[in-house]
Amino acid sequence: NYSELKNSMVEADPEIIIHMAAQPLVRKSYTYPLETFNTNIVGTANVLDAARSCKSVKAILNITTDKCYENNEDGRTFKETDALGGHDPYSSSKACSELVTDSYRKSYFENVSVGIATARAGNVIGGGDWSEDRLIPDVIRQIYEGHKLKIRNPNAIRPWQHVFEPILGYLILIEKLYENCKEHSTSYNFGPEETNVLTVKQILDLAKKSLNQVDYEIDQNNDMHEAKLLMLDIKKAKQKLSWKPKMSMDKTLFSTLSWYSSYYESKAIFDYSKEAVEEFINGEN
């Protein structure tokens, strides 16, 4: 509802807008392509257009995805200057969201000192994710709730990272964008070091070492196209934002699985989450 969004934004009178709302699932995008395109493309345009009515706005950050690149499966590590594209509706919609953001930046915000950037993160994991068709939540549901775990693409390679990593990057970027809109009104990749670029099967094997209960089967009926290889070049974020990933894959997985274990053991999950954030901020990784 554009009118409601605009009225709410004007009433809030924000200086900073971070747009994270999306239809985020590849398989769901095949089933509901129009919903996906409407949410991820028109939704982005609605946010940016509503922001034009807010004289207080100084910085806008649109969170997209590593899947926004044209992926020809040629082993490329994607840089921010690489071509955008997308085979499935989700990936395509996020590439379009990038283009919509760039158009609004150039058409309406370039001469009014409002910084607009986009952030492209890899496969994030971490406690509190209950989404469907996500590897770690599906593993957790198999262990604690007895659900069957079906794996679509065990050899798919992904840039895995704890959710704390890109969030820290977003906060650094939005601060830089607020202070210097011209220099930082661009796109940034936020991904892991190469040691965290692993196959789905490797992640499952690591999880099995910690939990000893991971049991899965390969989905032989999966005929939906998904990228086999995704890797991000993060030199730009390192150089311009002084950001870099902190957590090893072992620590990333341990932290994630520990959160879910604590949740199912009915521990004080808010306090546990707060301690995990403080540990990350203090660099205890």
Where are the language model's segments positioned?
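Proline-centered turn/helix-capping motifs that create local helix->coil transitions or kinks
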Residues: 69-74, 108-114, 129, 144, ...
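Residues in well-ordered alpha-helical elements
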Residues: 3, 15, 27, 34, ...
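N-terminal Rossmann-like NAD(P)+-binding domain of SDR-like oxidoreductases, especially those catalyzing
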Residues: 1-121, 125, 258, 272, ...
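The catalytic Tyr-centered alpha-helix of NAD(P)H-dependent dehydrogenases
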Residues: 85-93, 97, 132-136, 159-163
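A short, amphipathic alpha-helix embedded in the catalytic core of nucleotide-handling enzymes
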Residues: 47, 104, 138-143, 169-173
